[in-house]
């Protein structure tokens, strides 16, 4: 038995309200690189499904840039660490790690030789550091600012120059190498969010919260012209590959393209979803990529500012997932209430129209042509999968915090922290208070039976008779609070996962223990799924691993180590040899399984 990772459906860039998002591109314009939670994502532009997830940072990542040679990536995080690693080979070997500053890295850039790096941010002793990529030795001093530095850009050709942008409303200009302070350019009246050299190094431009763009000579730092560009803050600026134009993105939902020689406006694109545009990159002459505050990537054609494509994904931990009956679509929901529908064949996400949950989605299940969701906003909601939207009038207040939901006959069983509710057409039929605190629920596929797991380490078996609940049995073989339950598709087995990482397998009819030796996880079981033949059980755990257990050979299992760096949350079988998994890293992974 073995498994292999086939593909990764990547998370979108991590963003913060009213803060710029840094996105890098390689010199060929074929790939982009960006931070996502504690990972760095390298993604092909043409084939978005082709991506790599770098998981070696121990703190949330903030920025990543390709070296001009294209062989290395430098990435920074919240703890001030910069990691330089090989992005060309399969092993992604670490070249060096440097603690540049004592706080959050906001931006970094390479010189033209791919030998020196300047990293800036929110330090305590200093706001920036210039060092060599291979040894970490200092190659100058980055000083002169009195507040956090938001951006840095280096001139790639000689004579080397560098410019930094700060919250102290100034741009500092440096001569190199070694990099020494030359002068401070105090032209902005508010925070300066971005500064970028043109690809031909003749000029650099700055943008800030005052809505203005200033363009300077690349060698001397002398101001060339000023543009009153946007009404709101400008978060990002990026040059076209031929240096003839540049693009700005703003808090006013607009993206504007400017003539670099005259400073005149060429064209403008206004976002229809009314989200702040916090990042932009111009990788090729025919493509601009814009990032909004939700992390969604919009591909624009610079010639007419028409949308070519929009890439959706999750930013936060994926907490719930379910598969459509025909296994063509995968529905996922995250900690921030984002719900997406993934086309499995295209490996592409689409947003659902309508009002979603306002915070964490606890569980999703299929019920006929609908997806039922419950969230920590104490509501149950219904998604019409044919229309691709939330049903406007189908919102049911749960009363208490919901724990789980399942379908029995024509009813929904809603389990909260205090009771078990029976719903028919989103109308309460009956309610039963519990003397224990429920923690999980699952329904039998062939009978009017369901089970509820409790924090008291017990599983309670219920039947539904004419809308009334009837407890028929208890299973008390777990030694930790129950976290996950799953009946096999043929109805023969009941798997019970707990907070210690152990899975107990029961005979669903006799309630006798078949095996209690599936105890190879070291963390809480968060998700379980049976294959269609009811021969193998896949489990997802907080310990970052995914295991596949065999009913016929209980001690034989497949271990997918470090499947999701921050914890695996859900698993679903697409076919007998293909598995989908979700994680707290906001990624979805496709696995090939061989028995």
Curated annotation (Swiss-Prot):
What does the entry give for GO biological process? actin filament depolymerization; actin filament severing
Q: Where is this region: Disordered?
A: 1-21
- Which keywords has UniProt assigned to this entry? Repeat, WD repeat
Instruction: Spell out the Pfam families in the cross-references.
Output: WD40 (PF00400)
Give an example GO molecular function. actin filament binding
Q: Per the record, GO CC terms?
A: actin cortical patch; cell division site; cell tip; cortical actin cytoskeleton; cytosol; nucleus
WD repeat ranges per the UniProt record: 56-95, 100-143, 144-184, 187-226, 229-268, 313-352, 356-393, 433-472, 477-516, 520-559, 564-594
UniProt-listed InterPro entries: WD40/YVTN_repeat-like_dom_sf, WD40_repeat_dom_sf, WD40_rpt
Q: What family does the entry list?
A: Belongs to the WD repeat AIP1 family.
By what name is this protein known?
Answer: Uncharacterized WD repeat-containing protein C9G1.05
Q: What is the protein's species of origin?
A: Schizosaccharomyces pombe (strain 972 / ATCC 24843) (Fission yeast)
Lineage runs:
Eukaryota, Fungi, Dikarya, Ascomycota, Taphrinomycotina
């Amino acid at each position: 038995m073995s498994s292999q990772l086939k593909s990764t459906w990547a998370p979108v860039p991590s963003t913060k309200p009213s803060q710029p998002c840094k996105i890098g591109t390689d010199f060929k314009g074929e790939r982009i690189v960006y931070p996502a939670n504690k990972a760095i994502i390298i993604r092909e532009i043409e084939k978005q499904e082709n991506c790599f997830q770098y998981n070696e940072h121990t703190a949330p990542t903030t920025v990543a840039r390709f070296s001009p040679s294209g062989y290395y990536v430098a990435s920074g995080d919240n703890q001030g660490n910069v990691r330089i690693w090989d992005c060309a080979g399969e092993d992604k070997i670490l070249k060096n790690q440097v603690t540049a500053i004592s706080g959050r890295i906001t931006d970094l850039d390479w010189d033209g030789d791919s030998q020196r790096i300047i990293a800036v941010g929110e330090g305590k002793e200093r706001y920036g550091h210039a060092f060599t990529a291979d040894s970490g030795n200092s190659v100058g001093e980055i000083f002169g600012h009195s507040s956090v530095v938001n951006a840095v850009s280096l001139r790639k050709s000689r004579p080397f120059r560098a410019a930094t942008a700060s919250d102290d409303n100034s741009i500092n200009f440096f001569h190199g190498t070694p990099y020494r302070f030359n002068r401070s350019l105090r032209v902005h009246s508010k925070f300066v969010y971005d500064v970028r050299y043109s690809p031909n190094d003749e000029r650099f431009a700055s943008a800030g919260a005052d809505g203005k763009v200033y363009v300077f000579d690349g060698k001397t730092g002398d101001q060339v012209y000023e543009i009153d560009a946007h009404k709101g803050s400008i978060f990002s600026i990026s040059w076209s590959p031929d240096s003839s134009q540049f693009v700005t993105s703003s808090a006013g939902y607009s993206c504007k393209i400017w003539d670099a020689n005259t400073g005149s406006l060429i064209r403008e694109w206004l976002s229809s979803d009314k989200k702040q545009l916090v990042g932009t990159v111009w990788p090729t002459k025919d493509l601009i990529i814009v990032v909004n505050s939700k992390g969604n990537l919009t591909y624009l054609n610079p010639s007419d500012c028409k949308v070519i494509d929009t890439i959706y994904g999750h930013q936060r931990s994926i907490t719930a997932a379910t598969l459509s009956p025909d296994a063509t679509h995968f529905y996922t929901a995250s900690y921030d209430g984002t719900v997406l529908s993934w086309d499995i064949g295209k490996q592409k996400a689409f947003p659902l129209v309508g009002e979603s949950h306002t915070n964490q989605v606890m569980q999703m299940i299929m019920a006929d042509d609908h997806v039922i969701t419950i969230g920590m906003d104490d509501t149950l909601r219904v998604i019409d999968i044919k229309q691709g939207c939330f049903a406007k009038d189908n919102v049911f207040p749960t009363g208490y915090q919901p724990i789980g939901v399942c379908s029995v006959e024509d009813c929904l069983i809603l389990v909260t922290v205090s009771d078990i509710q029976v719903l028919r057409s989103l109308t309460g039929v009956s309610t039963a208070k519990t003397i224990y605190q429920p923690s999980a629920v699952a329904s039998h596929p062939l009978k009017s039976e369901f089970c509820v797991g409790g924090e008291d380490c017990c599983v309670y078996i219920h039947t539904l008779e004419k809308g009334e609940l009837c407890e028929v049995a208890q299973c008390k073989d777990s030694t930790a609070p129950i976290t996950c339950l799953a009946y096999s598709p043929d109805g023969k087995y009941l798997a019970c996962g707990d907070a210690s990482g152990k899975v107990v397998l029961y005979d669903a009819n006799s309630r006798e223990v078949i095996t209690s030796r599936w105890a190879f996880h070291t963390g809480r079981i968060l998700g379980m799924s049976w294959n269609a033949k009811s021969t193998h059980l896949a489990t997802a755990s907080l310990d970052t691993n995914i295991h596949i257990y065999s009913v016929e050979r209980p001690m034989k299992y497949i271990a997918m180590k470090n499947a999701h760096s921050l914890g695996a949350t859900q698993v679903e079988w697409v076919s007998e040899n293909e598995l989908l998994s979700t994680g707290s890293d906001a990624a979805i992974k496709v696995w090939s399984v061989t028995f």
